[in-house]
Curated annotation (Swiss-Prot):
Polar residues bias: start-end ranges: 204-223
Organism lineage string: Bacteria, Pseudomonadati, Pseudomonadota, Gammaproteobacteria, Enterobacterales
Matching NCBIfam families: PRK11653.1
Record-level GO cellular component terms: cell outer membrane
Naturally occurring in which organism (per UniProt): Escherichia coli (strain K12)
Stated name of the protein: UPF0441 protein YgiB
Pfam families: DUF1190 (PF06693)
Gene giving rise to this polypeptide: ygiB
Span list, region Disordered: 178-223
């Protein structure tokens, strides 16, 4: 009988511990999950140029100029490239395209292209840029160029998009938003030309994926 009592007491202690530690474990797990969410998102500001940034951040003029210039260089490297001005204008609108420097990430696909001089490709103008803290907690700032179309027929019309076609809402500088940290990561260099309308298709696909992800997240949170 003594042995039976000791077994029951041990079982009781085990069950009591499980019942009372479970909420604590859940609370700890929740804290870690929230911490993970905080680390995966970042608040960024959207500016059209260095002057906009400087006006919004007194005393940070040098940082704003550096971020803007870095964004321009990144735009040259990652922006969609077109073989002709007409293809670029059809996507982004009149007055929204410029010749791309020959060294801006493009590799000649054939001998004819290799013989062409600087400016043989066309790319959209940088419409603005995102600016946020460096990943890893550095003291500097990270930046990401943004593009926008003025052609009403384009899926990128009136929107800020990055080089991959991801949509960041209306092309209105001076606002802040929360984005995944991956949004500020460097994008791959553009090494081939885009066909007419190709970038718009990328924007449309990305927008569909974003809406789908948002809907799935809302349903999950709603149970």
């Amino acid at each position: 009988m003594k042995r039976t009592k000791s077994i029951r007491h041990a079982s009781f202690r085990k069950n009591w511990s499980a019942r009372h530690l479970t909420p604590v474990a859940l609370a700890v797990a929740t804290v870690f999950m929230l911490a993970g969410c905080e680390k995966s998102d970042e608040t960024v500001s959207l500016y059209q140029n260095a002057d906009d940034c400087s006006a919004a951040n007194p005393g940070k003029s040098a940082e704003c100029t550096t971020a803007y210039n870095n964004a321009l260089k990144e735009a040259e490297r990652t922006a969609p490239k077109y073989a002709t001005r007409e293809d670029c204008v059809a996507e982004f609108g009149e007055g929204q395209c410029q010749q791309a420097p020959a060294q801006a990430g493009m590799a000649p696909e054939n001998q004819a292209q290799a013989q062409q001089s600087s400016g043989s490709f066309w790319m959209p103008l940088m419409a603005g840029y995102m600016m946020g803290r460096l990943m890893g907690g550095g003291a500097g700032f990270a930046q990401q160029p943004l593009f926008s179309s003025k052609n009403p027929a384009s899926p990128a019309y009136g929107k800020y998009t990055d080089a991959t076609g991801k949509n960041y809402g209306a092309a209105q500088p001076g606002r802040t938003m929360t984005v995944p940290k991956t949004a500020m990561a460097p994008k791959p260099a553009t090494t081939t030309t885009v066909t007419r309308g190709g970038f718009g298709e990328s924007v449309a696909k990305q927008s569909t994926m974003q809406r789908s992800a948002t809907g799935t997240s809302s349903r999950s949170m709603g149970g």
